[in-house]
Amino acid sequence: MRVPSAKLLSALGSGWQVPAALRRLYADVVWLQQLATDELRPGPGRIRTSVRMAFISAVGAALMAALHVDSALGPVTLWVALYASTSRLTASEGLIMIVVYAATLIASVFLAGVLTDVPWMLLPFFGVATALGLYALNKLQLGGAWFNVVVGFLDTFYLCAFDPKNFGWSVAYSFSGIALAIGVLVAFDMVLWPDPAERRLLRSLADTLDRQGQRLAAIGRAYLDPLAVAVLPQPAGVSVLSSQLPLLERARRELGDPQREAILLAAVTTTERIHIEIERLLAVARDDVPRDIRLRLRPEMNGVLQTLGAALQHQAHRAATGLGPSDDSTDEELNTAIRSSLDTLQEREQLALSERPPAGAPAIANIAAFNLGLRRIGLRLLNKPLGDVHGLAFPQDMRSGATPSGGADPALMRHSAKLGLAATLAYVVGVASHRSELAVIVWTAVIAGLPTYGATLRKMILRMVGAVIGGLLGLLMIFVVSPNFESLGSYLLAFFIALFVAAYVGLSSGRLAYAGQQGGVSFVLAYASLSPNVNVHEPLWRVWGIFLGLVIVTLVFLLITPEYAGKAIVPRLTRILHAALELLRPASGMTEQRVQEINMDVTLDLTQVLGIAEDARMEGRHSGIVPDSVVEVAGTLRRIVHHLSGIATGRLAMPQTALPAEIQTARAGCDTAVRYHLQSWLEVLEDEHGPDRRRILEVAAHFTPDDLAVPLAELNEYLSGSGLGALASWPAAARSLLLAELESYSRLVVLVTELDHQFVEIPAAGAR
């Protein structure tokens, strides 16, 4: 009889105590198994994308070998561009990139020749040039192959140190390799094999929603199983948000359409919030309490689960078909069915609970929590079409991705300075070793230091693992392929196989992605050559250089002012709250254009907040924040800003309309109440000591339900009485705007109250 390993340990005789080391080993094995299952599961388009990345890289490497371009920087540039690109590469952008590469390499040849004679200036210049170059690229939001502009510039100084008389030829080969890499990428992105990010994102959303529907159904079956035989799903180890955010950013750059960007962002946020609510339902369902009360509600709960499943299926279909205009009749039917089933369940629940004796308190609390989760999913997340942005208008001439032009970014300056120091230390180590093959130590310091927040140690460990695996794979190809096959086809096939594996792993979440990406870089550096090469010494030195570069970057980032996600998220939430308050107290020069600009700025900030939440998942308790609560706050703030911008736009449309004194007083009271709550949270974030749990709890304790409900009740009372008759003489458009404003206030009361509760949950347990 086969006994599962988990039961085997518990079934051991009581006379033998399992050693703690064995228990830890078993736990680690189970964790690795779960990690591999979660991360390496085929997703929508994952195999296709991996094949595309590997094929393009292999074709580029084979082309460079056929043309006798003796530089590993070309294949590396192509691989880095494929996994780190923020958008597809157009012909005009590719031409600009080649011109910039040419200009920087020419300048580097001249400067290297001059500074070689003045070594005391070389190291300071090296560090400052690295920091300034990376700061400029990040400030301009230029990623992917653009980072190798700095790599190529710095590589010239390394080449000059070992061959000051003839290093110009090596620089020329580097430029040829980079130019070919860019040309290959442009050809595939634009003509041979285009891969729009929006299509990939929509496939991912559709697949995620479909999986969530299946997961919700499985939880419901197990929760309502009278015999408790059905097994609950395992808690999700990670969300798909980390894979969707890069696609969202690429789609934003490719589309250049603010309205479409907002729709995609709303869809991603809603999908993640559904994921969070379903995981909360799972946590409730795992409680071991009596089942009799839930079985009395089984027909009604099954009805709710079926309607929610149908709504999720409809949302998945909308994502799969492009998030086009919604079918109002279908949406209305689903909303009616959801509300009807939830109302029926609520009535039946109240009747059942009234008949339940006090001894069943745990079961009562459990069923109440489960049904509340169902209501949240049905009435807050599935009550609108996926991607709904509340009917906002967007500017037609504003670039989505525009960033504020004024002022320096202190966090980015610190990050760039650290990379400058790391690159300088790597240069010193490489030159002191007297090995020209260690040029990759400088490349690694720049490539591995792409801007991220938090989880430095874990990310660098993953990169080191990837470097070792990629290097070993390159050596394996040298031992197996090179002595037996000499054709260009075998060279291309070896590249394709190795880079397919690296690309597939690199498309995982942050828990494995860095290993796959770095593994691809290591393989390219170890195996790239002009002809089959059986000499392993040069590849070994390159792999060693990668390892040294990663160690240097890790030490610099861990020892010099390390930053965690909890710190990085504060300025973004602060900017969003400032934007909301600007809409609440508009200046005299406020225009509809400014309202739209505020909306787009908030959209960009929220995208960053979601990314930092994923970093916090990797950091765990060290981040000081709860990632799920951050995602909840992001979604709530997005809806608050959208409602406030709708109110501001409506008021700008009827500035000359004389309002009755009662309406003016009630509106002012609503504005004051919302402003009080938002301003209080802004002051918490701007505190010189930073937000801490005690301060957040103190602020939340001052809020009462009447803060928001009383002004709104006064406005409703007036309009329910004589106020509505007083509006009869108003123009229809003005009357509609005022009633729409009242509806927005009704939603703001709920949203601001939710925000108060969600802010309290942001600090992690034990955080200051």
List the predicted regions and their residue ranges.
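A transmembrane helix-and-boundary motif of multi-pass membrane transporters/channels
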Residues: 1-260, 367-371, 382-628, 632, ...
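Soluble C-terminal extramembrane regulatory/interaction domains of multi-pass membrane proteins
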Residues: 204-226, 267-393, 636-768
